[in-house]
């Protein structure tokens, strides 16, 4: 298992069903974390590492703000037509600090595993061919720091208590592990709860949400 | 390998009424967010992208052009046909800022009725700008001349009073760019140049000019996919001068390599410049720093600029 330390200065982990008021989840869903890790290693086939287990852990309590923003929708062509934009409120989180746990023991794809690739990307960044700014959620919400949770970095957060999204059959939170962007029939959720855990000890692997999609 | 260009910009000090939120009564409000425990004003990335697109238009033809008379965007190719073939004509704004046409699913819950999306991901990504200092609650009281706002003036010919939230501050924002993904790689230089010469962003009906051309910039040309410099600027004297303890900490921790950094400041004698020079970071004027970054990117990508 691998821990990745991530900071995002401004973020919105938009609730899947949010429409007029763009609410945020308290932390990025496993599907978002998985997408971020794929982007980190330069993988464009999102089915490549299905079976990976991913759990976000929130290290702090980011304050929530609300801003008014322009939201696009295409009602009329061409794109610039009036009526294609409307102002909507959006919740924003600031100063988000996270640890993302990744476990590849149940992955079904070909080697190397996502865990191995993420580790290699930290050791030899020049070996990775990737593009785009790293973000969690919207592309505007750029990630600032990404570090492997080992050595000095692990020591720096040692003893801190974080809130992890872990599987729980009767949990109070459902977060997506797979998002179907065009039509939502293929979107898959994991049920879990936010549990306090002391870092840098990783949670038990079988409680990490597993990335899976519909056949 | 993948070459990444990151930067964090900070504007000069000015009076801002940029990016309005929803009007409350007859007060035009600012957008605000909680930032390090205090209320700061903020300007959206969209507003910066809008200003950047206009600036890019001076260097090359853009797909989207703002028509002042129509007060809407006019498109050259709203279906992005130029991207279909390798040799198609593409526009600088689409290349850098991306595009998307999304068609909603006709019928939710089935694969047959799925929607579609024509997407090009932005190669240049921009973050939200956040004020360097907290907003103290400043509001100006104004009165529109009789007849100037017929909609607000229900009857008679009296002036219409209104208030405007303003913020005397600087703004900082960051960018990420992977120049290798551009159709035309020389556009990376045009983007850096436009950002270093950005003029007005957002604004309030032309009543305020807030200059977004950077007062200081830190650029990083690297293979590390994480910027590690976003929102790195700070101030200890209410925005009069800019410092960056965060950058110094990261240099000390060896999370940032001074060889990858290029810093531009408007005052070469300032504390920020001295602190960074002491850490072996090259410091130039803002325009010179921009030229230096372009030179490095061009050399790394082996492109003719």
Regions found by a protein language model. Name each.
Chain A
Residues 1-18:
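N-terminal, Lys/Arg- and Ser/Thr-rich interaction peptides
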Residues 5, 55-57, 101:
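Residues in well-ordered beta-strands of folded domains
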Residues 12, 22, 41, 83-87:
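Sparse, context-dependent recognition of short Cys/His-centered cofactor- or disulfide-binding micro-motifs
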Residues 2, 54, 96-98:
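Generic beta-strand structural signal
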Residues 17-79:
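Glycine/small-residue-rich interface belts in oligomeric ring/scaffold proteins
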Residues 59-215:
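Internal, well-folded beta-alpha domain core
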Residues 11-13, 43-44, 107-109:
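Primarily extracytoplasmic ectodomains and periplasmic/lumenal surface modules that are beta-strand-rich
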